[in-house]
Amino acid sequence: MNLKDLIKLLEVKFPQIDSNEVESKITIYKNYLQQENKIHNLTRLDKEEEIYQKYFYESILNFHNDLFDNKNINLLDIGSGSGVPGIFLKILFPHINLYIVESNTKKVNFLNNLVDKLELENVFISNQRCEDYIKDKIEFFDLITCRAVAELRILLELSFPGLKINGIGFFLKSNNYLVELDNAKNISSKLKIEEEPKIETIEYDGKTFVSLKYIKKNKVNNIFPRTWKEILNNDKN
């Protein structure tokens, strides 16, 4: 995939985007990622065509316009790493207020520099562990997402306290999602998650991309999220 291919796919998926602006920012992002990746090993993807397809496009494959209808949306990306999907979503949807929590200081430094280079506004990056960060952001977010960070049972505990009522938890998963759903039953009950998530699977380039969409309907007990040690030691079932 080249840059023009990527832009065409994005125009089909998100027809409202400013293609010229998006193309310009993707180029800046890609060049800076490649430059810094030689020093800091931010991603295993270094070939241009892989970055356009696997790094950018596949990171937002499961997202849809309706997730971003709110014109004053607070979006949290947990463990954004080198910026996907969070920074890329901000490029596509400039109106969002983007919050990123990332515990890796090297990656936080990269993200801060990237935001400056892209001249993005209303991006707030915190160098913290998520379980500590969320304690100060109870019922603050309209949408919380993450990609390949932790098992679902952990993500639910980290995210649900931070969601507003009717807020959305949108988690990108692998083919192992059924096992993760089963392992998350106990914590789902404790978090008063009554509805099953909406599951979407997309087949692309011989791979299956899965998203789990939860809607928060009930307040969460203020004991959550617990400490990381307590979360890890908690029985899955």
Curated annotation (Swiss-Prot):
Its EC number is 2.1.1.-. GO terms for cellular component: cytosol. The keyword rRNA processing applies. Gene3D superfamilies: Vaccinia Virus protein VP39. It comes from the Bacteria. Specifically methylates the N7 position of a guanine in 16S rRNA. This is Ribosomal RNA small subunit methyltransferase G. It comes from Malacoplasma penetrans (strain HF-2) (Mycoplasma penetrans). The lineage of its organism: Bacteria, Bacillati, Mycoplasmatota, Mycoplasmoidales, Mycoplasmoidaceae.
